[in-house]
Design a protein with these regions (language model features):
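Surface-exposed loop/turn elements that mediate protein-protein interactions on large endomembrane-trafficking
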Residues: 2-16, 45-65, 89-112, 140-165, ...
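Generic structural motif
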Residues: 7, 20-21, 31-40, 47-50, ...
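Repeated scaffold domains used in trafficking and secretory/extracellular systems
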Residues: 15-25, 63-79, 111-122, 159-177
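Short beta-strand elements that form the blades of beta-propeller/WD-repeat-like
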Residues: 28-44, 78-89, 127-134, 177-194
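Hydrophobic beta-strand residues in large extracellular and virion-surface proteins
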Residues: 33, 50-53, 61-64, 75, ...
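Extracellular-facing segments of soluble proteins and assemblies that are Gly/Ser/Thr-biased and enriched
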Residues: 82-112, 116-134
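Short aromatic loop motif centered on NTY/YTY
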Residues: 117-119, 128-136, 143, 153-202
Length: 255
C-alpha cells in the first residue's frame, strides 16, 4: 500500500488522476492552502498534495506531496510568525514558516513505526507544541515537543511523575489550553444527566431512555482535570482533580 516518496512523486501526481480540490485559509487570512487529492491504483489509498499560497502576492510558498489520503495540517504561530504543520509521509512531519518560506522536514529520518501526527497546537510563544498523535493503528494521545529551534529538530518532552489515571486522551470530549508559555491545562469531559445527577455511563437502560426524552438533559461536565508544567525539559503533572465518579473508578482500578 505504501510507495517510496520518489515513486509517489513520479507516478501519481498527474492531472488525469486529480479527483478533488479543497481550500483552507490560515488563521490570519494571509495564506491559503489548496489540498489536491489524487487517485493512485486499485486497492491503495489516494495521495494528496498541498499547495501553499500567499494571498496578497499570489505566489506559491511551498508545494508538499504526501503519501496518504488525508492531508493533516495545522496553522499556528511562533514568535509572531505564522507557520504550517503538515507531512510528506503519514509518519513524518514538515513545518513551513509562511513568512519566509523556510521549510523543516524529517521525512528522510522518520520510520513507519514513528508517531503519526494529526493535529498541532502551539503554546503562546510557539516554543512548545502539543500534538495529537498515534502509532499507526493505535489510539490517539497528546504529546509535547520542544519547538524552540526547528532547524535542529523537535524533541518529544517526556512526562515527569506521570499519572496513569489522568491519561491525556483525545478519543473522547476534552478541552485544553495554555495557561502561560510553560503551563498546560487538560480537562476530560463526559456527558452528564442533570435529571439523574449521574454521568451517562452510570445510567441504567431505563434512565437512558428517560434521559433521551428530555430536551438538553445531557450536559458536558468535567470528569477529571490535569495541569502540567514544563520543568527541566519535562512535562510535570502539577495538579490532578477528579469528579467523585472518577475517584470511584480509580479506587476500583486499584483493588
Amino acid at each position: 500500500m505504501i510507495d517510496s516518496i520518489n515513486q509517489m512523486t513520479n507516478d501519481y501526481y498527474k492531472s488525469e488522476n486529480l479527483i478533488s480540490t479543497k481550500e483552507h485559509f490560515s488563521t490570519s487570512g494571509k495564506y491559503k492552502l489548496i489540498v489536491e487529492t489524487y487517485i493512485t491504483k486499485p486497492g491503495c489509498w489516494n495521495y494528496t498534495k498541498g499547495i501553499i499560497h500567499n494571498i496578497e502576492t499570489g505566489s506559491v510558498i511551498q508545494e508538499i506531496k504526501r503519501n496518504y489520503c488525508v492531508f493533516h495540517h495545522s496553522f499556528f504561530f511562533k514568535n509572531n510568525q505564522e507557520w504550517l504543520f503538515c507531512g510528506k509521509t503519514y509518519y513524518s512531519q514538515c513545518f513551513i514558516n509562511l513568512e519566509t518560506g523556510e521549510i523543516f522536514d524529517n521525512s528522510t529520518e522518520s520510520k513507519p513505526d514513528s508517531f503519526c501526527w494529526a493535529n498541532v497546537k502551539s503554546n503562546p510563544n510557539g516554543n512548545i507544541i502539543i500534538v495529537e498523535q498515534c502509532i499507526w493503528g493505535g489510539p490517539y494521545e497528546i504529546g509535547f515537543y520542544d519547538f524552540t529551534d526547528p532547524s535542529i529538530g523537535w524533541t518529544e518532552l517526556e512526562f515527569d511523575n506521570y499519572q496513569e489515571n489522568y491519561y491525556l486522551n483525545i478519543e473522547w470530549n476534552y478541552e485544553s489550553k495554555w495557561l502561560d508559555n510553560d503551563t498546560f491545562e487538560y480537562i476530560q469531559k463526559e456527558d452528564y444527566s442533570t435529571k439523574f445527577q449521574k454521568f451517562y455511563d452510570e445510567l441504567t437502560v431505563e434512565e437512558e431512555l428517560e434521559s433521551s426524552a428530555i430536551e438538553n438533559d445531557l450536559v458536558s461536565r468535567m470528569y477529571y482535570r490535569v495541569v502540567l508544567k514544563k520543568i527541566d525539559n519535562k512535562m510535570r503533572f502539577m495538579v490532578t482533580e477528579s469528579s467523585p465518579q472518577h475517584l470511584i473508578e480509580i479506587q476500583n482500578n486499584n483493588e
